[in-house]
UniProtKB/Swiss-Prot annotation:
It is found in: Cytoplasm. It comes from Lactococcus lactis subsp. cremoris (strain SK11). GO terms for molecular function: O-phospho-L-serine:2-oxoglutarate aminotransferase activity; pyridoxal phosphate binding. Its cofactor is pyridoxal 5'-phosphate. It catalyses: O-phospho-L-serine + 2-oxoglutarate = 3-phosphooxypyruvate + L-glutamate; 4-(phosphooxy)-L-threonine + 2-oxoglutarate = (R)-3-hydroxy-2-oxo-4-phosphooxybutanoate + L-glutamate. Catalyzes the reversible conversion of 3-phosphohydroxypyruvate to phosphoserine and of 3-hydroxy-2-oxo-4-phosphonooxybutanoate to phosphohydroxythreonine. Belongs to the class-V pyridoxal-phosphate-dependent aminotransferase family. SerC subfamily. Disulfide bonds: none annotated. HAMAP family: SerC_aminotrans_5 (MF_00160). One of its GO terms (biological process) is L-serine biosynthetic process. Its EC number is 2.6.1.52. Keywords: Amino-acid biosynthesis, Aminotransferase, Cytoplasm, Pyridoxal phosphate, Serine biosynthesis, Transferase. This is Phosphoserine aminotransferase. GO terms for cellular component: cytoplasm. The gene is serC.
Amino acid sequence: MIYNFGAGPSVLPKEVLKKVQEELLDFEKSGMSVMEISHRSKSFQEVIDEAQSNLRDLMSIPQNYKILFLQGGASTQFSMIPMNLALGKKAYYAISGAFGKKAYDEAVKLSQTLDFEAISLGSTQSEHYNHLLKIDKSKVDEKMAAYLHITTNNTIEGTTIFPENLPEVNSVPLIADMSSNILAVDYDVSKFGLIYAGAQKNLGIAGLTIVIIREDLLNQKESLSSMMDYRILAQNGSMYNTPPTFAIYLAGLVFKWVKEQGGVKKLEAINRQKARMLYDLIDQSDFYQSPVLNEAERSICNVVFTSPSKELDALFVQKAEEKGFKSIKGHRSVGGMRASIYNAFPIEGVLELVKFMKEFEEENK
């Protein structure tokens, strides 16, 4: 049996893959693959409308928010967000992981040519991002603030800002990169001005990025590039140009699957159960360590851990691969191991990994 612990692209629900296989050559008796039908066709309009409706239901997205299906990966949002929201203002960033730093660095680069200021509220980089940044609200100029940017789940480092720990910044829009825990943890969308997520972790396949934006934040000026303008993209129903049709279709199937599993709250409970099995073993062991400083900040999507040495880490990864545990090697910047156990990852795979970890410890301690 193969278990895919990849951080993204990652495991997809078997039911979704079977549905794709079933419809691949003939979508809804059209005689064409969904990859072949026009994005302007009635058939595809129904696909994108249903996907949008199901996502709105799953996340309880208020009606004053637009849902956009975009290209370019979540990293493109590092540029689009300040371009659309920050002109003439101050853009604040809380940096608790590598992707948060990338978002900030991109804003700094843009601020050299565009009229806004990119401001870091601090970083935990010097501690290897082993904990989340404590945000000092007094450093935020509310009158001039365009937004505060956070990353809800740090895929590489294995930390999460859970809903109860979201920063409260009054009227300042909260912007969140939710790429690795959207639909895996239940957040109140109304607390955010904008949410974005690459699809290849919990939503589907690479090539699609979801943006959920409050309508009052849509850019009112026409000076931006049309392809980078949320307002134009929203006005055109995510089809200003040809969208990633197959990725949208597949995400729509994932949304249906999430509903069939009982919704986000139900999956979050299952994800917590899966993560707890691994963290319990790590905490009870003198062999394995979690690099995350605070237990309350541990991710339930990306469980990061190490053994007593880099040599044992390498041996663990080798033996794990031989056992069918794929892509469990930690990110190159961190090392160790990382078990990404997103929504579609089966609980049986976690049980098998726990068994393997115990055996490996006995053989190598």
